[in-house]
Amino acid sequence: MNILYVDYGNVVSQHHMYQYYGDLYRELVKKATVHLYQGPFHSAKEIDNSNIDCIIFGLGYFTQTNPKVYQEISGLSDVSIPVVCMLHKPQTMLQEKIEFCKKN
């Protein structure tokens, strides 16, 4: 299985202060081919015709406080790849995060 793991701020490192941010990523790497993307994700154009089987937005993605990162990602809803959101920190911008998950 090929997984695109989208996260933010290098939180998947085993040396990160809060290691649980990267626990899922580190376990997935043992079982699948995982492509890590860290940073803002604006368009699904690059993955439309790729061999990605699943897209996961990790815990670190949902620590961001910039509302722009929770906007609709261009073309992602048109791609027939399952998208998983690891919703995190619901006390901050919960409605924006829920809408992000619905739209994408």
Language-model segments: what does each one mean?
Residues 4-104:
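Extended catalytic core of nucleotide-activated donor transferases of GT-like folds
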